[in-house]
UniProtKB/Swiss-Prot annotation:
Taxon lineage: Bacteria, Pseudomonadati, Pseudomonadota, Gammaproteobacteria, Vibrionales
Organism of this sequence: Vibrio parahaemolyticus serotype O3:K6 (strain RIMD 2210633)
Protein name: Probable phosphatase VPA0505
Gene Ontology BP annotations: bacterial-type flagellum-dependent swarming motility
Positions that bind Zn(2+) 3: 74, 102, 132
Cofactor: Zn(2+)
Cofactor details (free text): Binds 3 Zn(2+) ions per subunit.
Family: Belongs to the PHP family.
Top enzyme class: hydrolase
HAMAP family: YcdX_phosphat
């Protein structure tokens, strides 16, 4: 399986990552990617930038080192209402919004509370994809959430870092369940390295292996094609990006 988009990456702006966006873009080029989503942590994460950082991504060139740049964020799901930690004014500046649970921001609670938070963040319409759902600290009703994601065209991320066992330990078994059920329900999937250093860009081997294990069709894996990824953004109501006309 060929992956041409890395949908989850971090720069030094996140506070605990180690590469610049230029270093990430060069790594993406060298590894054969066509599109790179830059998705730094949103403000409530310790060490993360002010929301102006995300609004000001409009100054970024659409291509760096010949790789198309998608302006994004890894937002924090804040509460059971499904609120995220960016003002509404930021939405117009962002191509790709991940929503994730992080322990310093949303203290692990009950399965019912996690489920409510995920359903409400989906229904908010502000989020394109749910990040690293396999974290065992945040159990949720998988069927209810995945069916809600499908009906609202919100993608489910397969996070390679979660599968390595180095972060969010114990995620692998839950990721397996999520992919199996997601395939049955017919959700869209994305693949993210969750790179915090440029050498991790496009490191997606475990995510690919898991998707192939369950026979997920390529047309449900957004990151296998620039056209598929960008058409999904149109489906989500995002404006067409004219600089990427050749990728549609």
């Amino acid at each position: 399986m060929d992956i041409v988009v890395d949908s989850h990456t971090h720069t030094i702006a996140s506070g605990h990552a180690y590469s610049t966006i230029l270093e990430n873009a060069l790594a993406a080029k060298n590894k054969g990617l066509k599109l790179l989503c830059t998705t730094d942590h949103a403000p409530e994460m310790p060490g993360a930038p002010h929301y102006w950082h995300f609004n000001n991504q409009r100054i970024l060139p659409r291509f760096l080192h010949e790789v198309g740049i998608l302006r994004g964020v890894e937002a924090n799901t804040l509460n059971v209402k499904g609120e995220i930690d960016l003002p509404l004014s930021s939405d117009q500046h962002l191509d790709w919004v991940i929503a994730s649970f992080h322990e310093p921001v949303f203290r692990p609670a009950t399965e019912a509370e996690h489920t409510a938070a995920l359903i409400n963040v989906i229904k908010s319409g502000r989020v394109d994809v749910l990040g690293h759902l396999g974290n065992p600290n945040y159990p949720f009703d998988m069927e209810q959430v995945l069916r809600c994601a499908k009906s609202h065209n919100v993608a489910i991320e397969v996070n390679n870092t979660s599968l390595t066992g180095k972060s969010r330990k114990g995620s692998d078994a839950r990721c397996d369940q999520i992919v199996a059920l997601g395939k049955e329900i017919g959700v869209y999937f994305s693949t993210g390295s969750d790179a915090h250093f440029c050498e991790e860009i496009s490191k997606l081997d475990l995510a690919i292996e898991l998707l192939e294990k369950h026979g997920v069709e390529k047309d449900k894996i957004l990151t296998t094609s620039t056209r598929r990824f960008l058409k999904f953004l149109l489906l989500r109501g995002k404006p067409r990006i004219p600089e990427f006309d050749a990728f549609y």
